[in-house]
UniProtKB/Swiss-Prot annotation:
Keyword Iron set for record: no
Keyword rRNA-binding in record: yes
Name of encoding gene: rplR
Protein name per UniProt: Large ribosomal subunit protein uL18
Function recorded in the entry: This is one of the proteins that bind and probably mediate the attachment of the 5S RNA into the large ribosomal subunit, where it forms part of the central protuberance.
Family assignment from sequence similarity: Belongs to the universal ribosomal protein uL18 family.
Length: 134
């Protein structure tokens, strides 16, 4: 059997690259969530990143309630000039303001299987600058 035939056999049938990446991210998120738990003292700050927008929530896992939320879909963020990274930073500022208004100082950061890079890192840094402690 030639080397090219071996390579062709190793490719998983019926799964494109996008599906494999999505499944791998879901697996990473599952592994991360096994060790993270949001409490009333330190709720979980969870990030969701799509190709166009970012959503972030502060969740108390014990009560099962969302305490604060922010998104790049909001008009305040849409008006922000710049790239997606700048908009992610604006979402981080918003969630920090809303957390402070709700009396939240400390959070547990849940990156949801995404790399701590780019928009996710910009959001986290802006939230830290806004006064949230991770």
């Amino acid at each position: 059997m030639s080397n090219t035939e071996n390579k062709q056999k190793r490719v998983s049938v019926g799964k494109d690259i996008a599906t494999r990446r999505r499944v791998a991210r879901a697996r990473r998120h599952f592994r991360i969530r096994k060790n993270l738990r949001g409490t009333p003292e330190a709720p979980r700050l969870v990030v969701h990143r799509s190709s166009r927008h970012m959503h972030v929530q502060i969740i108390d896992d014990v009560a099962g309630h969302t305490l604060a939320a922010a998104s790049s879909i909001e008009a305040e963020v849409r008006a922000t000039e710049g790239d997606k990274k700048a908009k992610g930073a604006k979402v981080g500022q918003l969630i920090a303001e809303r957390a402070k208004a709700a009396g939240i100082e400390q959070v547990v950061f849940d990156r949801a299987g995404y790399k701590y890079h780019g928009r996710v890192a910009a959001l986290a840094d802006a939230a830290r600058e806004g006064g949230l402690k991770f």
